[in-house]
C-alpha cells in the first residue's frame, strides 16, 4: 500500500508540473500576442503621424523620442496586466483569428497553386517523354513529319540486311544454370516483376524508341538488333551479329557527278595486257550536299595543277635560256659541243625556249657514250680561256 501511495504522489507531482508548464506556455503565447498587437498599432500610429501633422522640427525631436518610449513602456505594461488578469478583448481576439485565417487561406491558396503547377509540369513532362513504338515510328501512324523524314532518309539506296532468329539460341539460353552469371545485352533491362524491356536511342533526334516488353532477355536483344539495323545499317553494334545476312548490296545508280582524273578508271599496261582499276565506292550513306562540294573541290584541284604545270614550264624555259647564255661565255667555242649535248639531252624531257638551237647527238655518241668521248682543250685554248674576261 505504501508503494501505491508513493506512486500516486509521484503521479500527482508530475501532473502538477505538466499543468504549470502548460500555464507558462499559455501565458507566454498570450504575452507575445499582446506585444504583437500593440507593436502593430504603434507602427500604424507612427506611419500615420507624419501624414496627419507636419514633420517635427529638430528642436522637438528629443521630446518625440521620449514620448514614443513612454508609449512603448505603457503598452508593454498594459499588455502584461491584461495577460495576468486574463482579460483579452474580443475584437482583438477576433482580429487575430481573422489575420490567422487570412494567412492560412493565403498559404493554402499558394500551396494549391504550387501543387497545380507541379502537376501540370509533370503532365507536360510525361507528354514530352512519351515514346513511340517501332511500328508507329516507321509507319508514321502517330508520328510527326520529322519522323517520316527520318524514316525516308533511312530507307535510301543502301544495302539491305536480313536478321534471322534461330531456335537454337533460345534453347541455349534456357539451358543456363542459375549459378552462372547471365549475359548483359545492349539496350535491354529487366523489370522488377521479371519481364525484359528493350529500347533504342534514335540517332537522328534526341528521343528513345520503345521496342516492347519480352519474356526473356534474348528476345529483347533480338528486337534491339533489328531496330539498330534499321537506324544505323552496317555501323550498328549488335548483340547477335551472326544472325545478319546481306540481302541486297548498295544500288549503283548513275548520278550526274563530274568525273575527274581521280575518279576515272586507270589503266596499266603490264606485259602487253591491259587491266582496269576501278575506284572503290564507300558503302556508307553520303549526304546529297557532298556531291557539289566534291565537284568544286575537284575543279579547284585541277585548276591548281594546271597553274603549277604552267609555272614549272616557264621556270624551266628561263633556266634553259640562262644555260644558253652562260655556257658560251665560260667555255668559249670549245664548249659548244658540250652545250649541244646538254641541250639535246634536256630537249627530250622538256621543251626549250629556242628549238632551232637544239641539235640531236650523233648516233655513234648515243651508242658508245657521248660524254666519255669529249676531248678537253689544249694549252692554247686554256690560255685563251684564262685571258678571256670573266662573265
UniProtKB/Swiss-Prot annotation:
MF terms (GO), sorted A to Z: DNA binding; DNA-binding transcription factor activity
InterPro entries assigned to the protein according to its UniProt record, in alphabetical order: AP2/ERF_dom, AP2/ERF_dom_sf, DNA-bd_dom_sf, ERF_plant
Keyword Cytoplasm listed: no
Factors inducing expression: By abscisic acid (ABA) and stresses, including cold, drought and salt. Triggered by YY1.
Record-linked Pfam families: AP2
Annotated spans, Disordered: 45-64, 88-160, 247-290, 332-391
DNA-binding region: 184-241
Domain of life per record: Eukaryota
UniProt keyword Translocase present: no
GO biological process: abscisic acid-activated signaling pathway; defense response to fungus; ethylene-activated signaling pathway; negative regulation of abscisic acid-activated signaling pathway; response to abscisic acid; response to glucose; response to osmotic stress; response to salt
Stated name of the protein: Ethylene-responsive transcription factor ABR1
The organism of origin for this protein: Arabidopsis thaliana (Mouse-ear cress)
Amino acid at each position: 500500500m505504501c508503494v501505491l501511495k508513493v506512486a500516486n504522489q509521484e503521479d500527482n507531482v508530475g501532473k502538477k508540473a505538466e499543468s504549470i508548464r502548460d500555464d507558462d506556455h499559455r501565458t507566454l503565447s498570450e504575452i507575445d500576442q499582446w506585444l504583437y498587437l500593440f507593436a502593430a498599432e504603434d507602427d500604424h500610429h507612427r506611419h500615420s503621424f507624419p501624414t496627419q501633422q507636419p514633420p517635427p522640427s529638430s528642436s522637438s525631436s528629443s521630446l518625440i523620442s521620449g514620448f514614443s518610449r513612454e508609449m512603448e513602456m505603457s503598452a508593454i505594461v498594459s499588455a502584461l496586466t491584461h495577460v495576468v488578469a486574463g482579460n483579452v478583448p474580443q475584437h482583438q481576439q477576433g482580429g487575430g483569428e481573422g489575420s490567422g485565417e487570412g494567412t492560412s487561406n493565403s498559404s493554402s491558396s499558394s500551396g494549391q497553386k504550387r501543387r497545380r503547377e507541379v502537376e501540370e509540369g509533370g503532365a507536360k513532362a510525361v507528354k514530352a517523354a512519351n515514346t513511340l513504338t517501332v511500328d508507329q515510328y516507321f509507319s508514321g501512324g502517330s508520328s510527326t513529319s520529322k519522323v517520316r523524314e527520318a524514316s525516308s532518309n533511312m530507307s535510301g539506296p543502301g544495302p539491305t540486311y536480313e536478321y534471322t532468329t534461330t531456335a537454337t539460341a533460345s534453347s541455349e539460353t534456357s539451358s543456363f544454370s542459375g549459378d552462372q552469371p547471365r549475359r548483359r545485352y545492349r539496350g535491354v533491362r529487366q523489370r522488377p516483376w521479371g519481364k525484359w524491356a528493350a529500347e533504342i536511342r534514335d540517332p537522328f533526334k534526341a528521343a528513345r524508341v520503345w521496342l516492347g516488353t519480352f519474356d526473356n532477355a534474348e528476345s529483347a536483344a533480338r528486337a534491339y538488333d533489328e531496330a539498330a539495323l534499321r537506324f544505323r545499317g552496317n555501323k550498328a553494334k549488335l548483340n547477335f551479329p551472326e544472325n545478319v545476312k546481306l540481302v541486297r548490296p548498295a544500288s549503283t545508280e548513275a548520278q550526274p557527278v563530274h568525273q575527274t582524273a581521280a575518279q576515272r578508271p586507270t589503266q596499266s599496261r603490264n606485259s602487253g595486257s591491259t587491266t582496269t582499276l576501278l575506284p572503290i565506292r564507300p558503302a556508307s550513306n553520303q549526304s546529297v550536299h557532298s556531291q557539289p562540294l566534291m565537284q568544286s573541290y575537284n575543279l579547284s584541284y585541277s585548276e591548281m595543277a594546271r597553274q603549277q604545270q604552267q609555272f614549272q614550264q616557264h621556270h624551266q624555259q628561263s633556266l634553259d635560256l640562262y644555260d644558253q647564255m652562260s655556257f658560251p661565255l665560260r667555255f668559249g667555242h670549245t664548249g659548244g659541243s658540250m652545250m649541244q649535248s646538254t641541250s639535246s639531252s634536256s630537249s627530250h624531257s622538256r621543251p626549250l625556249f629556242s628549238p632551232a638551237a637544239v641539235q640531236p647527238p650523233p648516233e655513234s655518241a648515243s651508242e658508245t657514250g657521248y660524254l666519255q668521248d669529249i676531248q678537253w682543250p689544249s694549252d692554247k685554248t686554256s690560255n685563251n680561256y684564262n685571258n678571256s674576261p670573266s662573265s
